[in-house]
Every structure is written in C-alpha cells, then in structure tokens.
Amino acid sequence: MRTAKTVLTVIQERGKQKKPIERVYKLLFNRELYLNAYAKLYPNNGAMTKGVTNETVDGMSIQKIDRMIEILREEKYQWKPARREYIKKKNGKKRPLGIPVWGDKVLQEVMRQILEAYYEPQFSEHSHGFRPNRGCHTALQEIQVWKGTRWFIEGDISQYFDTIDHKILLEILARNIHDGRFIRLVSNMLEAGYLEEWKFKQTISGVPQGGVISPILANIYLNEFDNWIEEVLIPKYTKGKRQKSNPEYNKLTAEIQKLRKEGDAKTAHQLVVERRKIPSVNTQDENCLLYT
C-alpha cells in the first residue's frame, strides 16, 4: 500500500502538468489517507462536535476505517444530512453552519486532500483565500509591490457557499477528474441535505459552510472566474507597455534634488513626505493596467 504522501505527490504532479486524473475513486481504498485525515482533524476543536448522530472522534478506530472502505468498494456509502446551526457574525446577522457526522467528516477530509493536491498548483497566484500557507498576510504582501495603483474594488459574493450551482461544479470537476464514481460520490454528498430543528431539508444548491471539503470546492468553482480575468479580461484591456509618469511627481522630484544641492535638507525632507502621498505614474493614462 502506497503512503499518503506518495499518493498525494503523484496527484500533485499531475495537477502541475494540468493533466487529467483517472481512477480517483480507488484512492479512497487507501487506509493511509484516512489515518492522515484523522491526524489532521483530531486536534481541531470541532472534533468532538456531534452531527446528527452521537459519533465523535473518540469513536474512530482502524476497524471503522476498514468498514468504511469496504462500503465504498461496494459503492454503498450513504452520506448523512448535516446538522444545521446558526452562528453570529460581527454585523449581528447569523451565518448557517452545517455540521457533518464524524465518519462523513473523515471521508470529506480524504477527498479534500486529493482535490487540494491536484487543484492547488493550478490556482491563480493572485488568489489567497482558503489556501495552504496563504491568507490576509500574503494578500497584503502582494499589494505592497503594486505600483501606480490608486483604485481598489471591494466586492462580496452574497451567500457564496450557499449559492454554488451543483451542476456547474460537477461539470468543472468532471473536466479533469475522469472518474464517474468519484463524481457521483461528490454529487451525493452535495445532495445529502441537512437537519434544522430535526426537520430534513433538501439542498438543491451550495456547499455546506462547516463542511471540511467545502472551501476547496468553492475555490475550484471560483477559479473559473480567476482564469477568465487573467486569460480574457486582462489581455483585452491591457494597453501599452508602461504608464506615463506623473508630472506632479516629477516636479517634486526635481525640486527635492535642487534643495539637496543647495543644502536645504529640512525642506527637501518635507517635500519627500509630500511626494509619498501621490503616485509616480499617471493613473488615468490609457496604458494603465486593468489588473496587476
């Protein structure tokens, strides 16, 4: 049996080369991946949180893992509905949270590791959300090296996780994951529904917030938008090679140099501070890049 590291490394290499992967479902028969998933989930605070059953991390065993694998071999795995709770947001509103049972959570983590290994090398370098070793800090680091940027557009996709179209998501996955059994397993998971106040409700769209696999699925879905921006929109609207310099900035630079030659360091420093407040290039220039 191959180690989890070996399996994920092979998948990662396929992802780097943007080559399709096959027989993904068979990877779910590898016990090492479940032990890897268990080690990942066990330290989390939510490990003891119950779903719609009393099953928690303490009830996991090698025997249960083997039984889960056997059920998967028979293609009889049944996802259980998530238990829905609501948590308060900073703005006072409430956000729905879907809590899966422990067995489903472990299987989701195995699937997440496979998907992450394959898709992570293909994601945009300008994407920072829900990604390993990335976040607000890396986004800020990228912004710091931008030049001539005066405008930022802040946007929010309302209820993004809840509105992801299942059909489109599955079509995106099926492009490069040539394994009908694995795609069906994902589809069944998306349609497992949830219990709210012990009443079953169907899920016709979205991925559950609180699901281990949900962030990677959301990123795979939104990566289509990133690709469109970088491959279609940027080439279409990017003109010229560089922006024209800002006359006001150049004027201050010349004045600073003059003052330094005259020995007036104090006034020169004041102008340096003032110059920092304006861009060095003309942000209204037609050569201005739409996206950097």
Residue ranges and their predicted role:
Residues 1-290:
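Non-catalytic terminal/accessory segments
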